[in-house]
């Protein structure tokens, strides 16, 4: 007899891990497949000289709101420690620096004091953000939001962030500050609905944190759950081909890359929408065209360095450099000089337990920058590519030293990763957040043309780690059914188990 499961989940990034824990905790039999040798996707860490470094997950928001509630639902909150993270924005052209306080009200007050002529417009802006937050049920799981639809239709769905700021007559560096978190979802202000931006910006601006041990803390909690709940989790394995569809347009079997076969009731993809096309049988032309019309977000070039213990200018937190206040130019790649670079300073522990200071820098990039090496793979790229990486890392370091001169001579390179590195190890396309969240665009989510196939792929509803977890919760509700969903969420949030 072939192995059988209720849910076959493809991928163990944050969406796959969340779906696996939700379904298994609710009593479903789950098999999760990961094509890599280890789980976690962008949540993974790697090590150089015994120092842990983040792959793609650097910080999150909303620990006091929905993200913390999601950890309770998954039964892993006790395994996760949040570290409050400061935010400083540096405009490289003017030299102006803004230290932004945590908390929406504190941020509003701070910006009004810095830009008094725009105070009325700022009050309107933040009132709109609060309205979006208050009317998004998924952000209020403890007060009945768990039993409402995921995202309601709001008036803010029908105006872009850029158009709203135009209406408010907000320009220059203030506009850059309000659009700054666009680099955390990858969609330009002129494309993203204000509501989608507000949902991301509110959590990050209100409660910016990194996790102690980074995304590895979530991966470790997931692996513990796979043992506790007897989850069938397989690495280095994916689907080779699917069985035949029945008259009901459902498929219930698959041959795996390890040569085994498996039967299932439901199958869930968590990959980039275009990766789904490679596996999905009988994808019609209309469906294929819809997916191929999606636009990818930017990628990141990431550089890592060790910082001497006696270095001046080291302050834990996020130091963000913007070469322009025009985030459309930054995130569309229309101006090669328009860049956003985040520098995350943190204290980590080496494998031997000793503390060390690190900085992780991530700068927005686009495929054209590395197109000459598209047909190469990690470990087999030419000297010109290595020179590009070294030059890029040096430029990112020099930009930082302009504004933090006390670090000169105190930074020691550990590693770097281009958009191609991320393409080879994670997403098949190297995009940091999957597809862009354009206004009036219907992203790929839920049921697919094969009637028992579903997707909770990158940016299905909301981008980022918290967005992916909430997307997974919505799909769990659809497949588990309302009765199981209500009982599960009520029990978890009341007991905190």
What are these regions (language model features)?
Residues 175-185, 402-462:
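A glycine-rich dinucleotide-binding beta-alpha-beta segment and adjacent secondary-structure elements
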Residues 309-417:
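C-terminal segments that line or cap access tunnels to active or ligand-binding sites in enzymes
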Residues 94-192:
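Rossmann-like flavin
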Residues 2-128:
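N-terminal glycine-rich phosphate/pyrophosphate-binding loop and immediately adjacent elements
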Residues 240-354, 496:
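Mid-domain catalytic core of redox enzymes
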Residues 481-497:
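Active-site-proximal substrate-binding core of FAD-dependent oxidoreductases
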Residues 198-251:
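Helical element adjacent to the flavin cofactor pocket in flavoenzyme catalytic cores
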Residues 456-483:
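A conserved FAD-binding loop/helix module that cradles the flavin
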